[in-house]
C-alpha cells in the first residue's frame, strides 16, 4: 500500500541551478517538509536525472517522500517513491502497473471532484485540488473551492491542496480538511525557506 502524503509537500520551481535547487530543497526538508516533488519542465534529460538523484538522496536523509512530476520513466529509473500526473501527463493506470502497488501516484484534479473519483478508480493514491488560492505559478488556474476537501474525505481520499498557499492562508486549507499542502512560491521565494517551512508545517501540528 502506498504511503499517505501528509503535512507540508514542497514542490520545486523550474529553472534553478543545481546549487540553488539543492540548498533550497535541503532547507525546506530541514524545516519540516514531509514530501518533495521534483518539477522541472526542461527537456534536458541529463540535468533531470542528476537533479532528481540528488533530491532523492536529500529526501532519504530527512525521511521524506520523493515524488517526480510528470515522468514515470525517471521515477522508475531512480526508484522514487512515486509520481505526480496532471491532466496531460500520462495514464494513471499505466503508471500504477509500471511502478507497482506501493508507489505514490498523485493526480491533479483541479476544481472537480469527478476527476478525483476517476483518478482513484484508476489507481491514484492521492488527489490534488487547486488552485485553492490565487497562484503566481499558474495565474490562470481555475479556483478550487475548499469544500472539495470535505467531498474528498467522503471518498476516503488522501487529498492535497495546491495553489497560492503561504503561511498566512495555509490554515484555511488545513482546517477545510486538506491532508497536505503543496507549496512552491510560499517556500522557494521566501527570504528564509527553512523558516517558511516551519511556519507551514506548524499548521499540521495544531490539527
UniProtKB/Swiss-Prot annotation:
Kindly list the positions annotated as binding Mg(2+). Answer: 70, 89
An example GO BP is:
thiamine diphosphate biosynthetic process
UniProt cofactor note:
Binds 1 Mg(2+) ion per subunit.
The Swiss-Prot or TrEMBL record lists the needed cofactor(s) as: Mg(2+)
The reaction(s) catalysed by this protein are: 2-[(2R,5Z)-2-carboxy-4-methylthiazol-5(2H)-ylidene]ethyl phosphate + 4-amino-2-methyl-5-(diphosphooxymethyl)pyrimidine + 2 H(+) = thiamine phosphate + CO2 + diphosphate; 2-(2-carboxy-4-methylthiazol-5-yl)ethyl phosphate + 4-amino-2-methyl-5-(diphosphooxymethyl)pyrimidine + 2 H(+) = thiamine phosphate + CO2 + diphosphate; 4-methyl-5-(2-phosphooxyethyl)-thiazole + 4-amino-2-methyl-5-(diphosphooxymethyl)pyrimidine + H(+) = thiamine phosphate + diphosphate
One Pfam family name is: TMP-TENI
**Pathway(s) where this gene product acts:** Cofactor biosynthesis; thiamine diphosphate biosynthesis; thiamine phosphate from 4-amino-2-methyl-5-diphosphomethylpyrimidine and 4-methyl-5-(2-phosphoethyl)-thiazole: step 1/1
**What PANTHER family has UniProt attached to this entry?**
THIAMINE-PHOSPHATE PYROPHOSPHORYLASE, THIAMINE-PHOSPHATE SYNTHASE
Q: What does this protein do?
A: Condenses 4-methyl-5-(beta-hydroxyethyl)thiazole monophosphate (THZ-P) and 2-methyl-4-amino-5-hydroxymethyl pyrimidine pyrophosphate (HMP-PP) to form thiamine monophosphate (TMP).
In Swiss-Prot or TrEMBL terms, this protein is called Thiamine-phosphate synthase
Organism of origin is Chromobacterium violaceum (strain ATCC 12472 / DSM 30191 / JCM 1249 / CCUG 213 / NBRC 12614 / NCIMB 9131 / NCTC 9757 / MK)
Amino acid at each position: 500500500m502506498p504511503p499517505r502524503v501528509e503535512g507540508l509537500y514542497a514542490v520545486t520551481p523550474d529553472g534553478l541551478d543545481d546549487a540553488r535547487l539543492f540548498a533550497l530543497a535541503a532547507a525546506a526538508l530541514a524545516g519540516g517538509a514531509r514530501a518533495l516533488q521534483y518539477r522541472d519542465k526542461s527537456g534536458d534529460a541529463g540535468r533531470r536525472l542528476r537533479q532528481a538523484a540528488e533530491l532523492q538522496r536529500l529526501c532519504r536523509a530527512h525521511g521524506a517522500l520523493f515524488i517526480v512530476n510528470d515522468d514515470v520513466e525517471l521515477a522508475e529509473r531512480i526508484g522514487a517513491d512515486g509520481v505526480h500526473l496532471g491532466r496531460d501527463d500520462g495514464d494513471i493506470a499505466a503508471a500504477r502497473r509500471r511502478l507497482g502497488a506501493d508507489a505514490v501516484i498523485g493526480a491533479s484534479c483541479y476544481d472537480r471532484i469527478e476527476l478525483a473519483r476517476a483518478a482513484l478508480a484508476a489507481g491514484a493514491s492521492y488527489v490534488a485540488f487547486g488552485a485553492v488560492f490565487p497562484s503566481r505559478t499558474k495565474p490562470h488556474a481555475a479556483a478550487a473551492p475548499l469544500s472539495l476537501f470535505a467531498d474528498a474525505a467522503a471518498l476516503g481520499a488522501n487529498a492535497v491542496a495546491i495553489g497560492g498557499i503561504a503561511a498566512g492562508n495555509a490554515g484555511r486549507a488545513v482546517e477545510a480538511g486538506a491532508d497536505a499542502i503543496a507549496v512552491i512560491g510560499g517556500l522557494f521565494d521566501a527570504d528564509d525557506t527553512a523558516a517558511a517551512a516551519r511556519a507551514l508545517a506548524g499548521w499540521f501540528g495544531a490539527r
